[in-house]
Amino acid sequence: MQTEARPLVSVVVPVYNPGEYFAPFLASLQAQTLQNWQAILVDDGSTDGSAERIDSAARADARILAVHQPNSGAAAARARGVALAEGEFLLCVDSDDLMHPQMLRALVQACQSQNAQLAFCRFAPFTETPSPDTEPPAGQPLSGQAAREMLLHDQRLDYALSNKLFRAGVLTADMLRCPYRYNEDLLASWRAFAAVQTAVFLDFDGYHCRQHAASTSHSGIILPFLTDQLAVAKLILQDAEGTSLQASAKAFYYEKLLYLESMILRQSAQSEFDSLHSTLRAELRCGFHDAMHSAFLGTGMKACALLSRRVPPVWHAVCRLLLRDKR
């Protein structure tokens, strides 16, 4: 029987300068219909007063633990929080987003009903405050392999950790420690999914990711934004080599190459990325044949591959005028 001595869910929250968005985030956490949770708020060197805000939240609510560290990045903050987690389940979310009021309850019940190690819902971007009225549906059980393929290819799942509830011990602090600041959450998810035998997908917008005014597709990018993502994709490809996930991972890797090239082509100043762009072009040429015959690449992505390979000027125009951000 569940006792109140141990929280049912530990919610780990890296906090770095969320500003005005922290209060609505905290309200959405405290409005959860499942109330037996522990929140570990890890201040990652905030400079906007958030350190004081999380201390105040911890004084007002005994379920909240405030932790402080020098700025080390979201991955390090998550790892710090996960190491302190006491719950039977674990969820990592961001301090400027919102959760559906039934998110925790629905994901926990899905795990319990299917004896699953993982449950996840849709990851939904928003600009206006979303409606909380949607009723969570029954979950769809999946094998661990199907969940990993979904992670790589299904945009409903997204790469983020925020919409994924794990049983304690599946996602570990060591999995979260890595040298990358971009797609580090994808790498952690991929590693954790390897320990999953059964997962459950709930097809509803349970997690709402706030879209800020400045988007990567409309502002300058820095080289590590691209090189970190390429490094993470290579690690996933290497990890899948020789397994039943190899073909799926190869398709994912090719899609990532196309995405990274598209990000370079969206920039008005591209000279900084010339060396990386040459590397991407070479890998795109090498993988083109397999990509065009892959069952894991959709028609739209194959069309992008054709444009990139056969008519680069048109591909460049498409990237500049039509494409949107995709993590």
PLM ranges: what are they?
Residues 28, 35, 43-52, 70:
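A conserved acidic beta->alpha catalytic loop
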Residues 69-85:
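Glycine-rich, basic loop-to-helix element that forms the pyrophosphate-binding segment
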Residues 90:
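Short aromatic/hydrophobic "clamp" motif used to bind/position activated sugar donors
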Residues 102-134:
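Conserved donor NDP-sugar-binding/catalytic core segment of glycosyltransferases
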Residues 146-222, 226-229:
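Conserved nucleotide-sugar donor-binding catalytic segment
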Residues 17-31, 53:
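Short, well-formed alpha-helical segments that are part of the catalytic scaffolds
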Residues 206-212, 219-245, 259-262, 266-288:
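Catalytic core of nucleotide-sugar-dependent glycosyltransferases
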Residues 266-327:
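Membrane-interface aromatic/basic loop that binds lipid-linked glycans or pyrophosphate carriers
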